[in-house]
Amino acid sequence: MPLLSKCFPCFKFKREEVIDKLDYSNTPLTDFPEVWQHERTLEELYLSTTRLQALPPQLFYCQGLRVLHVNSNNLESIPQAIGSLRQLQHLDLNRNLIVNVPEEIKSCKHLTHLDLSCNSLQRLPDAITSLISLQELLLNETYLEFLPANFGRLVNLRILELRLNNLMTLPKSMVRLINLQRLDIGGNEFTELPEVVGELKSLRELWIDFNQIRRVSANIGKLRDLQHFEANGNLLDTLPSELSNWRNVEVLSICSNSLEAFPFSVGMLKSLVTFKCESNGLTELPDSISYLEQLEELVLSHNKLIRLPSTIGMLRSLRFLFADDNQLRQLPDELCSCQQLSVLSVANNQLSALPQNIGNLSKMKVLNVVNNYINALPVSMLNLVNLTSMWLSDNQSQPLVPLQYLDASTKTQLTCFMLPQVTFKMNSIQAQQQAQEQYEFVYANQQQPHASPSRRICFAEEATILSNAKAQPAPNYPSFVAAPPTPTPDQMAGSVRLMRSPTPYPKELRQMSKYVRQAQAATSSANASEVREARVVTNGQIHCDSNNANQDVVDQATTSAIYGIAPETTHIYGVYQQPQQMAHPVPTQEYYGLPLVNYEAHYQQLYVEANTPLPTTHLNGDQDYELQPLQQQPMQQQALPTPRLEPPPYHIARVYTKKTPEDLNLYESMRQRKQQQQLQEQTIYQDALNSNSNFKTTAIGAQDVEESVDQLDYQNNISNNLEPNPEEEDQELDDTMSQHSLNSTATNNTSKASHKKSTWIFGVHKNPTVKQVTLKWENSIGFDIAELLNQVGIFVSSITPNTNAARLLNLNDKLLEIDGYDLTNANLSDAKRVLLNCGTVMNIMLSRK
């Protein structure tokens, strides 16, 4: 044949190119490659991260395909033609949008590896259990709630990963998985380790981390071939003693649980190399830990250990020891026998000294003793020739610092400029409070240039300095009351203002902070007055308004926390002087002001007329502190400054600035439903007003119309909220009706000041909130009424749950009127008769505490 092709070139055949592997990974594809041209020879096809939307049917002509990777794409389904790939052994479909698996996949009899992780399966089809050749099955983050009952048919399975699902139990048929070597059920909803796990005797790796497991059954001791056990982030408080049968375990990690002690049998884990048990409640370690001859890494941080056992010196292979954030007071001298120790970290403890023979740890490279009570270092530290980092302070700039002899004559101790360590250590709550106070102080100073000249406390000697009068000896006023003197123009020109800015805001808050400061500067009052003189008077000499007393105490407590004021609250009184540009005269009556502490929060000043001056109080012997009369400014001239608005914390702002589209759609649907509900209620209420208007008297009808207008205005205002809160809406309505009632009362008192005081009609409600509600009922009214002992009127005695009455009424609400019928002087029988005669929609006016 070769001779014939040479003599006759027309008989020369072109040799077919053999291609058995194609790799298009990480290449965006607009069109699917024509891989079917190699359908006879193609065995491996890699299409990872290629933005595929679907698999074409021509792909399945390659019936010799053994490996198919289509992970990290946008596939929404698996074609039914997948069953034609009968030689397929490795199928990777993770990180797609697949919601179901076709039944035809059971035709892939030779499939050994199947990865469906990070898809929205929610349910595993029974066809998967027909793949009896399957050895590796990865179903991580697929929203599974259960496994098929016949899952045990996969007898050849070696690796099973079910991490990050919603599983609560495992099928009992898994006992047949005699070849299973790795089981990962972390991140599920298990509350107890399934009994079937203890029967998987070939298991080598068991991951049960981040569940809610409280107990591990004793049959777990049957896992004699176990090498890796991970149980972090559970609720374990004890471990079974049967774990001593794990003679081959090398890694044991049980961090972030509730363990207080280990069983003595933990020392029987002869092959243990890594032992992690941080973030528990351990108070001590068992002495049997000395039998862990192969242990190289021991992590004990974030526990409650008071001491380390002396037998720890028997750990000859120990290389890493972490015991930070405990309550250790000393380290045992036997620790210096761990010749292989290279990293020792015991920060945030109560150590006062290090072992004298610490120099025997010749392989030591890193030593961390930050935040302890160490005064000096032993002289044997000079023998640590391999030491590369020695951390003595959080503010240490270099890993190593030069050491000197503490006493040149004895030469037994070493020191440096960071020793002795500071003995004062704040707990987490104190540190958080101090950080908050520093932030508020710095932020207040930063905002001061933008604020307008509002009220400030200025003492007598400061006023003298400001007016360039003759200097007088400054009396010893309390330092926490005095405000810094206002600098003169000469002082302003000759000084440079230095200010430390806080940490920059996140990117989302910078523009918000800018607008807040501009709004403050624009809305601050330009005509505000200044306090020229102030005196300090104790609480016992001042009568505070009951409506403002609680808020004043809170503000004063906050001021005390920031500036270190004594616990006893003081009230400050000042003399307000009328600005010269005021066009209206100042009243001549004398007024004493209510307590003024935080002038930015309490910008509305209230005054009560004083009939007699307060007595003079003598403090500190010789010095007199007198309460001076205040002059009230006309209300129309007082600008109401906007309270200082600090930027919200980052974790709150992030919620409002980084919402996902799903969240925004959800909020929009909630808002639309709430608007529709409010419009329906408004329509029902308006119809009820129109139908019942003929039964009301003239006076009551006018009042109802006025109150209904207020209620409709209120409903129109709240309809624009994104996420209305029913409790907040009721509170605002109560405040609106209460304010309307108070205004009406004030008007009547002004016009009829000479009339005799009328009888209080609200019964037990000493500070009532009168409101009108529209109650619609179907099967029953939803509430009962009764008369209270020694009280006049009709009150709500009981409410039926899950009714409109339960949402609108409260117990002990006093009923003033029902559908125009006055109940203030009615008896119980008349009131019940009114309830029986009313329709399915009733208008109720009531008073509430």
Swiss-Prot record:
| Top-rank taxon | Eukaryota
Q: Where is the composition biased (Acidic residues)?
A: 725-735
Q: Which Pfam families match?
A: LRR_1, LRR_14, LRR_8, PDZ
Disordered: region residues: 716-752
Any one GO BP annotation for this protein: protein transport
Q: Which UniProt keywords apply?
A: Leucine-rich repeat, Repeat
Q: Polar residues bias located where?
A: 736-752
LRR repeats span 18-39, 41-62, 64-85, 87-108, 110-131, 133-155, 156-177, 179-200, 202-224, 225-246, 248-269, 271-292, 294-315, 317-338, 340-362, 363-384, 386-407
The task this protein performs is described as: May have a role in assembling adherens junctions.
Describe the family membership recorded for this protein in Swiss-Prot or TrEMBL.
Belongs to the LAP (LRR and PDZ) protein family.
The protein depicted here goes by the name Protein lap1
